[in-house]
């Protein structure tokens, strides 16, 4: 089953949106297999955003993600990477549709509440970066047969 990585950024944690974000993914039928509240080290932030290292906004990304607690999560389900991106909305909240997390709660691109992996390969890399294998729990919800054929 496909997995994706999500992180509620410091602004989402401070605004008490963690429960609402989890609710949306559970309501969709996805399974939470990893969850932790953590302070992100500068090293982890630089690895996570490594593809942007040469861009002028890189220092601001690192500074922001390390400015407060983050809730890191791994979700599992059919097509979860693409579905999560739709639930999250466009990177710039001003371009996000109402009904998406960023469309409903975001105002500024630099404070866009949540990160979600953009591809299956990216999700695999990010999950390995943020979680040890023992931190991921395999389990079977009783409602699975009501969601998937």
Curated annotation (Swiss-Prot):
Q: Which residues bind ATP?
A: 9, 57, 85, 91, 102, 112
Cofactor(s) demanded: Mg(2+)
Q: Which UniProt keywords apply?
A: ATP-binding, Cytoplasm, Kinase, Magnesium, Metal-binding, Nucleotide metabolism, Nucleotide-binding, Phosphoprotein, Transferase
According to UniProt, the reaction catalysed is:
a 2'-deoxyribonucleoside 5'-diphosphate + ATP = a 2'-deoxyribonucleoside 5'-triphosphate + ADP; a ribonucleoside 5'-diphosphate + ATP = a ribonucleoside 5'-triphosphate + ADP
Enzyme class, UniProt record, top EC level: transferase
GO BP: CTP biosynthetic process; GTP biosynthetic process; UTP biosynthetic process
Q: Report the principal subcellular site.
A: cytoplasm
Q: Which GO terms describe its cellular component?
A: cytoplasm
GO molecular-function annotation terms?
Answer: ATP binding; metal ion binding; nucleoside diphosphate kinase activity
Q: Where is the protein situated, by its record's location annotation?
A: Cytoplasm
Enzyme Commission number: 2.7.4.6
The record places the active site at 115
InterPro entries with a match to the protein in the record: NDK-like_dom, NDK-like_dom_sf, Nucleoside_diP_kinase, Nucleoside_diP_kinase_AS
SMART domains per UniProt: NDK
Q: Function, please?
A: Major role in the synthesis of nucleoside triphosphates other than ATP. The ATP gamma phosphate is transferred to the NDP beta phosphate via a ping-pong mechanism, using a phosphorylated active-site intermediate.
Subunit-structure text:
Homotetramer.
Protein name, entry field? Nucleoside diphosphate kinase
Quick one: which gene encodes this? ndk
């Amino acid at each position: 089953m496909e997995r994706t990585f999500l992180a509620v950024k410091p602004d989402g944690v401070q605004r008490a949106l963690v429960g609402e974000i989890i609710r949306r993914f559970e309501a969709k039928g996805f399974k939470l297999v990893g969850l932790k509240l953590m302070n992100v080290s500068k090293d982890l932030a630089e690895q996570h955003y490594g593809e942007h290292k040469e861009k002028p906004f890189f220092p601001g990304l690192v500074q922001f993600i390390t400015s407060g607690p983050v809730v890191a999560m791994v979700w599992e389900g059919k097509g979860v990477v693409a579905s999560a991106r739709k639930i999250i909305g466009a990177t710039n909240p001003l371009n996000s549709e109402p009904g998406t997390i960023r469309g409903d709660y975001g105002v500024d691109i630099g404070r866009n509440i949540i990160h979600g992996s953009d591809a299956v390969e990216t999700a695999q890399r990010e999950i390995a970066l943020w979680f040890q294998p023992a931190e991921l729990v395999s389990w079977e919800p009783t409602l699975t047969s009501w969601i998937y054929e």
